[in-house]
A protein has these predicted regions:
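Rossmann-like NAD(P)(H) cofactor-binding subdomain of soluble oxidoreductases
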Residues: 1-71, 87
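Conserved residues at beta->alpha junctions
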Residues: 2-3, 31, 78, 173, ...
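Internal alpha-helical scaffold of NAD(P)-dependent oxidoreductase catalytic cores
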Residues: 7, 18, 43-53, 71-158
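Generic structural signal for well-ordered, non-membrane alpha-helical segments
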Residues: 8, 33, 37, 41, ...
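General beta-strand structural signal in soluble alpha/beta enzymes
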Residues: 27, 53-58, 98-102, 223-225
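Alpha-helical transmembrane segments of multi-pass membrane proteins, especially transporters
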Residues: 30, 56, 135, 139, ...
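NAD(P)-dependent Rossmann-like dehydrogenase/reductase catalytic/cofactor-binding core
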Residues: 121-125, 150-160, 164-260
Length: 260
């Protein structure tokens, strides 16, 4: 299934009666559902009554480059390792390398939250800030993603892999990224909704930041960068003021128990 996150539920409902008994469902959608805080594979499993294994296929893989057969690596993740390895075998080839994982929670959270961080780094580019600021937001953004993930049962080392750090790097630095480009426009002063319209495609980070904020509140996890992004995107706060508030947070030790 390769739909925007808000279309996964309806799409799963449309196809569930067409599936063979031995089917394996593969989701390449990235996000967290608004209102339910469910990941994409959770939605599919719920709608299909958990009758089929659902695999998340994710990683640093801009479609434009995959189509050109640029060497790429991703992760096939499912608690059912047999299903993950079947998908691995189906997709792996000389230009598309696939690793398997049982940590679907970590893989899907990394996929969803990297879009939020890409909006942030794009905003920094739009404001004319340097590489230092973007590196700070990417690194600390990954830290809070790992913090949320481990609270929900993910393995912390997943966030150092392709679906975590890998996807974060490619999405936060490339003009192929819709979220990064939208962030640039916002940083240049374009109103949020106008920036999204100008991109002309779904900006998943806009939806993910609200869902991630709700999910973090549910499990009591601190996510300051995600909340800062929410303030800019939903409360029309000035990005420079929000960044300054992040810089003025209480000092702390860098390495956490949930970090690498």
């Amino acid at each position: 299934m390769a739909t925007p996150s808000f279309g996964v539920r309806s799409t799963a409902g449309q196809v569930k009666d067409l599936l063979a008994p031995d089917a394996i469902l593969v989701s390449v959608s990235k996000g967290i559902e608004k209102g339910t805080s469910l990941r994409m594979t959770q939605i599919i499993r719920e709608v299909t009554e958990d009758k089929w294994p659902v695999v998340a296929l994710s990683g640093p893989s801009h479609a434009e480059e995959v189509a050109r057969q640029v060497p790429t690596a991703v992760v096939s993740a499912c608690p059912d390792q047999t299903a993950a390895e079947v998908v691995q075998d189906l997709f792996i080839n000389d230009h598309f390398r696939v690793y398997s994982s049982s940590d679907v929670i970590g893989v899907e959270l990394g996929a969803a939250l990297k879009n939020v961080m890409a909006l942030c780094t794009g905003c920094c580019t739009g404001m004319g800030l340097g590489d230092n600021t973007k590196a700070m937001l990417m690194t600390r953004g990954l830290a809070e993603t790992a913090r949320l993930g481990t609270a929900l049962g993910a393995r912390k080392d997943t966030f150092a892999g392709l679906a975590g750090m890998g996807d974060l790097i490619v999405t936060c630095t490339s003009m192929n990224s819709r979220n990064y480009r939208a962030g640039i426009l916002i940083g240049q002063g374009t109103p949020v909704q106008e920036a999204i319209r100008k991109i002309g495609a779904v900006v998943e980070g806009y939806y993910a930041v609200d869902s991630a904020r709700e999910l973090a509140a549910q499990v009591g996890v601190e996510m300051p960068i995600t909340l800062a992004a929410y303030d800019v995107l939903y409360r029309d706060r000035d990005p420079r003021e929000v960044l300054l508030s992040l810089m003025r947070r209480e000092k702390r030790h860098e390495i956490e128990e949930t970090w690498f």
